[in-house]
């Protein structure tokens, strides 16, 4: 099964840039920035690979990667390395999310432009993978920062219409209020951007109700969705982005066997398997499919169907979706023969 899943041309719809650098890529990035003998960097790498079942500890790990990407060179190289990691896992399409940041080395506009340029450069090196960009709103940051992010996303989407396709709302779910960001998200939607919203990542029924009423293009995590919530999403054909390893390692799900993917499959609601932060959680999309297959008894045919479901729920153009589905279909045909 693992070899089959490795060869499957997969589709990744929930991947955060700064969390998607594997240990090898982190070491490559650290070597590029600091050389091979930096003891502080090696110590940080060792800490990064340890894990506690605690969501706050997960978010603390991002501070390490943010430091590595705090320069133009670091950000550019990190973007290319993340794409390399997905390409090596035979991911044919990825929608990468990242929160624009500002420091003494770049503005938020610069940040997005650096990432855009890196994506375009990587397309020459890794032509087999298509990369799209979803600028992220961090709900832990002030509303005016979110306003700037959406403004930049709308502007840059005009310049790069086939690259920036939507907006992501993410960040520590225990911080900020959705109601503060809803008007900004509505503006993005009115300008033609899709909305990928982290929803029900922690238990907060009133916020979930508010989010479902507001609407979204895809639902991130959906850990604490009720059967009624899942039914609403099914009725609206809104896919739930399921990140198994992430949810277990961050402590929001007790075990793989208790993961809500099972309930979603039983309800026959739209769902996609994703990594979330493949570097932080030491996983790959191949591993996530394998975990789902071993935990819930998925067949090869079901894994192919899940991949086609991801194609359908991607923000890609109709022509791109047809091309992706053809690659999956051709792979399935080869196996049958």
Curated annotation (Swiss-Prot):
Signal peptide: none annotated. The keyword Chloroplast does not apply. The record marks 221 as: Important for catalytic activity. Keywords: Hydrolase, Metal-binding, Nucleotide metabolism, Zinc. InterPro entries: A_deaminase_dom (IPR001365), Ado/ade_deaminase (IPR006330), Metal_Hydrolase (IPR032466). Binds 1 zinc ion per subunit. N(6)-methyl-AMP binds at residues 16, 18, 66, 98-101, 171, 201, 276-277. CDD domains: ADA_AMPD (cd00443). It is an enzyme of class 3 (hydrolase). SUPFAM superfamilies: Metallo-dependent hydrolases. GO terms for biological process: adenosine catabolic process; inosine biosynthetic process; nucleotide metabolic process. Its cofactor is Zn(2+). Its EC number is 3.5.4.-. Gene3D superfamilies: Metal-dependent hydrolases (3.20.20.140). Catalyzes the hydrolysis of the free cytosolic methylated adenosine nucleotide N(6)-methyl-AMP (N6-mAMP) to produce inositol monophosphate (IMP) and methylamine. Is required for the catabolism of cytosolic N6-mAMP, which is derived from the degradation of mRNA containing N6-methylated adenine (m6A). Monomer. Belongs to the metallo-dependent hydrolases superfamily. Adenosine and AMP deaminases family. This is Adenosine deaminase-like protein. It comes from Drosophila melanogaster (Fruit fly). The gene is Ada.
